[in-house]
Amino acid sequence: MLGIANAVMNVLVQGRRHKPAKALEIGIIDELAATGEEMLDKARAWIAANPEAKQPWEQPGYKIPGGTPSSPKLASILPAFPANLRKQLKGAPMPAPRNILATAVESTQVDVDTAFRIEARYFTELATGQTSKNMTKAFFYDLQAINGGKSRPDGHEKWAPTKVAVLGAGMMGAGIAYVCALAGWEVVLKDVSLEAAEKGKTYSEGLVAKGVKRGKTTLAKGEALLQRITPTADYNDLAGCDIVIEAVFESVQLKQEVFREAMKVVEPDALLCSNTSTLPITELAAGLDRQGDFIGLHFFSPVDKMPLVEIIRGERTSDAALAKRSTSPSGSRRPRSSSTTAAGSSPAA
């Protein structure tokens, strides 16, 4: 048993999987084994040595580490838990962490059988709630349909880009550059100055460093990812790019300007994508040539954590452009919605 504070804030609401050594360090497992056979041997030995084993809470005089909500020490810090949880979630209305906290606080004030009923009640609320249904639909049924190509127009072969131009190295552009490089694409990260573009690349460097530290990637893989991102302030470096993803300020004039400059040097059939979240795709495309190649590609922030991309089709977006965007590596692994915007409408409408 870890105690309420440690269990809730450091384990239960984190939603993370732990490597065996870390799990042992935290205290959520008791022993490690190198092989399955060794694990069985240790389990048999423990059972033989403890024929009358009981759960910790069944032992005479057992007390929860750190106390219960009624103990003065825990009671003095318990009111801060909801605020800390909200800060951790960045205000997102996620019901599971809330129910976990409620279960821990309520169940530690009653007998164990009542505690199990409290846990079952909160779990049932989550499993049958609308949020669970929405996530099941989006991440299972919708994702299966997307990966099966049901959202891709008929008559178009699968396509994958080789070199990506990301216009704008701010928070969104930096994140987009990272996920594109993670997908294996060569990325040219363009901003108004080389300093700004290099600053955008440091975002990827930070993510790689965290990944290596946490064992989610290797140093070699991280370095290879970073080598795929080239920061620049020169439009000429976009030569050879077969997809453009714009992530500059929300200004129709500015967005059209950077597209015009990029279109002078990228591949003549390059897919033109805007990450806008507020401006109508049809209006943005209206000031450009090749409106059929123009499409909305709205990533959600933070890009490296949000498994969602919204594809927005303009009035003149061609089936070929939609098919390209629907078959790219990042698109195929990310659930997203597809819609059409009319002149004067918003992608969010």
Task: Annotate each language-model stretch with its function.
Residues N6-Y122, F139-G155, E223-E246, K324-R334, ...:
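Amphipathic alpha-helical segments at domain termini/boundaries
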Residues E31, A80-P82, E195-A196, K210-L272, ...:
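Rossmann-like NAD(P)-binding element
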Residues M1-A7, R17-E25, S274-A348:
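Rossmann-fold dinucleotide-binding core
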